Design a protein with these regions (language model features):
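Short, cationic low-complexity segments
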Residues: 185-195
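Short, surface-exposed, polar/charged, turn-prone segments marking secondary-structure boundaries
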Residues: 37-41, 123, 171-175, 193-195
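Non-heme Fe(II)/2-oxoglutarate
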Residues: 1-85
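A short, polar/charged loop/turn motif at coil->beta-strand junctions and beta-hairpin connectors
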Residues: 4-5, 90, 162
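Catalytic core of non-heme Fe(II) oxygenases with the double-stranded beta-helix
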Residues: 100-154, 161-166, 171-186
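Conserved double-stranded beta-helix
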Residues: 57, 62-63, 73-128
Length: 195
């Protein structure tokens, strides 16, 4: 399967089992920490520094923009992404979600900072993603690379308990690239963007 021809490609076992297990445990604990901090009013409900519970796409579900561990992964996987896409890329941002039972990801295309997008299955119950009308099942460690701004993608209602995904986003290295999603560097929250 060719990324250039099909606008998406699946890489099986792109991330080692050891790294996947670390990321899964890390994000499960991070979600718990965020819940405790919000629930006990240690941080206000509008803080995004520990992630948030809900966004415009998936309400009431834990998500985090620009997590430092995920953004290190974004940089470390860039050579593999360049090899598979045959494009010179720059990192833009990461986003993590811990989907729960009943969640739906509506059919959409991504924004400008997501020219080359990847979804990495970190763990939990399997949940197919549809890309350009094709049903794709990713196991932990598998990555789907796709042209996020061009390919419609979605997920039907989730029937499992939890499914953790990390989204890794890149732009082609060209003058109008959204380097670091308009932040000074990786790892910063989205409110630091220079828009």
């Amino acid at each position: 399967m060719s990324f250039k021809k099909n606008k998406y490609v699946v890489i099986k076992k792109a991330v080692s089992k050891e790294v996947i297990n670390f990321l899964k445990d890390y994000f499960i604990l991070k979600r718990r920490v965020a819940w405790t901090l919000f629930d006990q009013n240690h941080i206000n409900q509008f803080s995004q520094d520990y992630g948030r519970f809900g966004d415009g796409q998936v309400p009431n579900t834990y998500a985090h923009y620009g997590d430092v561990a995920a953004e290190v992964l974004l940089s470390k996987l860039k050579p593999l992404m360049e090899k598979k896409t045959k494009l010179k890329l720059v990192e833009t941002y990461t986003y993590m979600r811990a989907y729960k039972n009943g969640d739906v990801l509506k059919k959409h295309r991504d924004r400008k900072s997501c020219e080359v997008s990847c979804t990495l299955n970190v763990g939990g119950d399997l949940w197919p993603i549809f890309a350009d009308g094709k049903k794709i099942i990713l196991k932990p460690g598998d990555i789907l690379i796709y042209k996020g701004c061009e390919i419609e993608h979605w997920r039907e209602p989730f029937l499992g308990e939890v499914c953790i995904q990390i989204f890794l986003h890149y732009n082609e290295d060209k003058p109008n690239a959204q380097i670091y999603d308009n932040r000074i560097h990786l790892g910063l929250p989205d409110y630091t963007k220079n828009n």
